[in-house]
Each structure stands twice: as structure tokens, then as C-alpha cells.
């Protein structure tokens, strides 16, 4: 699904209408439900996009298919709830068994969307739900079609708390995307996010040399 505008150290010439902005965790404006959303999934999408956890619970109770069925653009309902930042909806979906590993058309898992939006509480919840340390690392290392990890997305959005959380959980500050950029290079110059990521990468270098 949509994530904050790309910044990979190269000039991106994208139309303004393609840029998606997140402001202090505010949800995106509601998307219009169109023919791309199958009729039997529209109740799920409406609930996820509005953050109505009661409507979502009802829609799930009446849904006979998979909870991980793509609803639009390859997104699952969990992707949408993470994208919009609706924590109660994320909690409900995880309780119902929604997959943390489902990928959308851009290769992103729900954690990518939560990190892109700077939704710290959701990110923490998803890492807690992973269960094992190995699965946590699997999620932290997941890459989308541009080779970005969740940490790349958090860095690009300059979400300090999420960056700190991901680093503490074991995310690599040295992983490069397909443009050869580490997370620090996606944050603006002279920001705390960039400084923390540069320091983390340097520390990782020191450890690897020991």
C-alpha cells in the first residue's frame, strides 16, 4: 500500500498526487471504495479504513473467507489497519490470526506500513505478537520491492520513537536497499533520526571488527 514518498538519495520525479503524507499519526483521508474491492470484502475495508473496531468485528464474524485475503492493491485488512494507524483494529486482527507476513503488491508486510506511519504502539504490538526472537528478526529483515526494511520506512518518515524501537529489537542499521542506501541515508540531514542511525551503523561496524 502507499507509504511516505520515496527518498533514496536520488531525485524522484513523482506527481504530487502520488505522495502520501503522515502527520503525527493522523489517519489518511478515507479512500473511496471502488470496483477494485470485491463486494464481499467491502464491509471489512470500510471498517478498517474508518477505524471502527465494532464494525470490523462484525464484518469478520460474517466473513467466510480468509482473514488474509487481499482487499485492494494486494493489501490485507491488517495492512490497511496498520497504514491508517488504528491500534484497536490491529489488535483484533492479530487476535483473529491475521498474518504478519502477508505482502502487498509492493512487497511490503504490515510492519512496513506501521513503521512508515510512525505508529509506535502498533509496531510494538506486532513485534510482541511475533512470539519468537527468530520471527521478530524475520519481520525486521523483511524487504519490499525496493529493498527497504521496516527501519528504512521509519527512517524515511523520520519517526524517532519507531526507529529507536526497531533498533532495540535488533533491526540492522546497515542493511542497504536496491539503491545502495542504508536507513540513515533516507533521513534528512542534521536530524536526530539520522544521527542515531549513523551512530548505530558505526557501532555495528565496531562489533563486526572485533
Enumerate the language-model features and the residues they cover.
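Alpha-helical adaptor scaffolds
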Residues: 105-108, 112-138
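Ankyrin repeat boundary/linker residues
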Residues: 37, 71, 104, 143-144, ...
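Ankyrin repeat A-helix N-terminal signature
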Residues: 46-51, 80-86, 113-119, 153-159, ...
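Ankyrin-repeat-protein effector appendages
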Residues: 2-43, 168-169, 178-210
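N-terminal segments that cap or nucleate solenoid repeat domains
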Residues: 29-77
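Conserved ankyrin/ankyrin-like repeat signature
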Residues: 55, 88-89, 121-122, 161-162, ...
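Ankyrin repeat domain, specifically the short helix-to-loop turn at the C-terminus of the second helix
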Residues: 60-65, 91-98, 125-138, 164-171, ...
